[in-house]
Amino acid sequence: MNILNKIYSLLILIVIVLAVIAFIDRSKKIDYSTLLFTSEPLRVREIYLKSGNSDDYGNFNYPNPEYFAWKQSEPSSDNRFLNFPDSLSVTYFSYTDSLFYHSNVSIRDFNPEAWKEYKKAGEYNTFSLGIANKGWIMLWCTNDSKGTTLLLKTQLKPVEPGPQDLYYIKQYNKQDYITEMFDNISDSIRLNIKNHYYNTDYQDSTDYSLKP
C-alpha cells in the first residue's frame, strides 16, 4: 500500500507540474496582426512567423504580383493566441531577377534588446514585413506603448529551388516554371521588368510608421 501511495503521489505531482507549465505557457500567448508589402513583383510560396519549437505559426496575406508598393499594405492578417515570434520563414520567387529565395531567419538576433522589450510587454502587436529587390527583407514591430521599431533587416541569398518550389498546378522543371510564372503576369508588369522599373535600391529604407 505504501508503494501505491507513493506512485499516486508521484502521479499527482507530475499532473500539478504539467498544469503549472501549461498555465505559464498560456499566459505568454498574445494576439498580433501581420502586414506584408513588396517593392517588386513576387510569387510567394510561404511566409510565416514562428516561435521556437511550438506549433504556433503567424500567417501573412500574400502579395499580388500585379498590385504592390513599398510600405503600402492591406489587408492585415490576424493571428490569435500565439507565442511571441522569434523567427521568420520566407520562400518566394522574384520576377525581377528570376531567382528563388528561401531562408529561416532569427528575429531576436538582429536587435535583441528591442525584441526582448516587445516580447516582455505582452501587448497586441503588428508585425510589418517588407520585401525589397535583391533579397532584402525588413521586419518592424508596432504596439501602443513602444511605437514602431525595426526588429530585423537582412539580405537573403538566392537558392536553387527544390521540387516543391517548382510546383504550380503541376510539377515543372526550373526553366518551365519560370516561363509559366511570366505567362501568368500582365504585359505591363513584364514590360516594367524588362525596362528595370523595379530596380530601386530600398536596403536603407528603414524608416517606417504604421498608419492608423
PLM region spans:
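Low-complexity, Pro/Ser/Thr- and charge-rich linker/hinge segments at domain boundaries
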Residues: 107-141
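Activation corresponds to long, low-complexity, non-globular regions
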Residues: 14, 131-212
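Structural motif
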Residues: 34-46
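Contiguous beta-strand segments within globular domains
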Residues: 25-36
